[in-house]
Amino acid sequence: MLQPKRTKFRKMFKGRIHGLAKGGSDLNFGTYGLKALEPERVTARQIEAARRAMTRHMKRQGRVWIRIFPDTPVTSKPTEVRMGKGKGSVDYWACKVKPGRVMFEIDGVNDEIAREALRLAAMKLPIKTRVVVREDW
């Protein structure tokens, strides 16, 4: 699964996800892409599950680009532990996704396979998405 090799700080504030994606809202690599329509935290496990669903449907043909990276540590305290006594330890890594962000791109397969692969990937994610197609061909 994806996670940073090293970070400046071990733990991070929760924060909020405001506004639309400034960058990463256009297709840069592939012909088909999966674009987020709402703000949400996407975990490294969800990204990996979506990637596996896509590559499995494409039968190892074509190419998949993952345009998001889980760089936010999410902490949690163990079960049945009282409040206080500091912040919990890092449980998993997540990526804050804003609306308009292209998360995955596909190329090298036909239209039907690409759309179905992206639909299967979208099922694994906790947000509403839309399949986008490059128009300048």
UniProtKB/Swiss-Prot annotation:
<dbReference type="GO" id="GO:0003735">
    <property type="term" value="F:structural constituent of ribosome"/>
</dbReference>
<comment type="function">
    <text>Binds 23S rRNA and is also seen to make contacts with the A and possibly P site tRNAs.</text>
</comment>
<protein>
    <recommendedName>
        <fullName>Large ribosomal subunit protein uL16</fullName>
    </recommendedName>
</protein>
<dbReference type="InterPro" id="IPR047873">
    <property type="entry name" value="Ribosomal_uL16"/>
</dbReference>
<keyword id="KW-0699">rRNA-binding</keyword>
<dbReference type="InterPro" id="IPR020798">
    <property type="entry name" value="Ribosomal_uL16_CS"/>
</dbReference>
<dbReference type="InterPro" id="IPR016180">
    <property type="entry name" value="Ribosomal_uL16_dom"/>
</dbReference>
<keyword id="KW-0689">Ribosomal protein</keyword>
<dbReference type="GO" id="GO:0000049">
    <property type="term" value="F:tRNA binding"/>
</dbReference>
<dbReference type="InterPro" id="IPR036920">
    <property type="entry name" value="Ribosomal_uL16_sf"/>
</dbReference>
<dbReference type="GO" id="GO:0006412">
    <property type="term" value="P:translation"/>
</dbReference>
<dbReference type="GO" id="GO:0022625">
    <property type="term" value="C:cytosolic large ribosomal subunit"/>
</dbReference>
<comment type="similarity">
    <text>Belongs to the universal ribosomal protein uL16 family.</text>
</comment>
<keyword id="KW-0687">Ribonucleoprotein</keyword>
<dbReference type="InterPro" id="IPR000114">
    <property type="entry name" value="Ribosomal_uL16_bact-type"/>
</dbReference>
<keyword id="KW-0694">RNA-binding</keyword>
<comment type="subunit">
    <text>Part of the 50S ribosomal subunit.</text>
</comment>
<keyword id="KW-0820">tRNA-binding</keyword>
<dbReference type="GO" id="GO:0019843">
    <property type="term" value="F:rRNA binding"/>
</dbReference>
<dbReference type="Pfam" id="PF00252">
    <property type="entry name" value="Ribosomal_L16"/>
</dbReference>
